[in-house]
């Protein structure tokens, strides 16, 4: 019985490389001279420190640009509300999404079952296993899921016949 897995994996090594490139660019750019702007990663969370909202916005653009160069989709970042730090400075936490959370997995399963395609979907931890009688059904599921409005990037792997 053909099957495949729907997963959401994040390459943390590539995120670290992008953060190092952002830090290097911040230290070299003229508009960041004298500014105390940093980006740090601790487990699955980034902390962006900037002098003001304008610098924070520029750091968002830098971070997204460097992630795109490293083939990491910007959808893996979940920006929280910026908060005031000491003086004029601003701090923002950014969660890094890795794996499918339960609500998103349930929503995808519900949408696939509601589509009328003849496949079975099972939640296995932080991934989904989709199996069906025909390979064409599975390819239709992949196209259907790609058409859903999901912020988190998804990968399709272990396609077996």
Curated annotation (Swiss-Prot):
Disulfide connectivity?
none
Q: Which UniProt keywords apply?
A: Nucleotide-binding
User: Which Gene Ontology CC terms are recorded?
Assistant: cytosol
The cross-references to SUPFAM superfamilies, in alphabetical order and at most eight, read: YajQ-like
Output the superkingdom of the source species.
Bacteria
Molecular function GO labels:
nucleotide binding
Could you tell me which InterPro entries the record lists for this protein?
DUF520 (IPR007551), UPF0234-like_C (IPR035571), UPF0234_N (IPR035570), YajQ-like_sf (IPR036183)
Q: Give the protein's function.
A: Nucleotide-binding protein.
Q: Which family does it belong to?
A: Belongs to the YajQ family.
Q: What is this protein called?
A: Nucleotide-binding protein Plav_2177
């Amino acid at each position: 019985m053909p099957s495949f897995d729907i997963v959401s994996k994040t390459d943390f090594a590539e995120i670290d490389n992008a953060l190092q490139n952002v830090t290097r660019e911040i230290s070299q750019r003229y508009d960041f001279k004298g500014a105390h702007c940093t980006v740090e990663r601790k487990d699955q969370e980034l902390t962006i420190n900037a002098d003001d909202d304008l610098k924070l916005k520029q750091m968002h653009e830098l971070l997204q640009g460097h992630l795109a160069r490293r083939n990491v989709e910007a959808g893996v970042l979940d920006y929280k509300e910026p908060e005031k730090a000491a003086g004029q400075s601003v701090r923002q936490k950014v969660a890094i999404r890795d794996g499918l959370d339960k609500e998103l997995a349930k929503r995808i399963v519900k949408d696939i079952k509601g589509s009328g395609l003849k496949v079975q979907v099972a939640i296995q931890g932080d991934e989904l296993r989709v199996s069906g009688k025909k390979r064409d059904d599975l390819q239709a599921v992949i196209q259907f899921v790609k058409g859903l409005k999901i912020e988190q990037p998804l990968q399709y792997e272990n396609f077996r016949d």
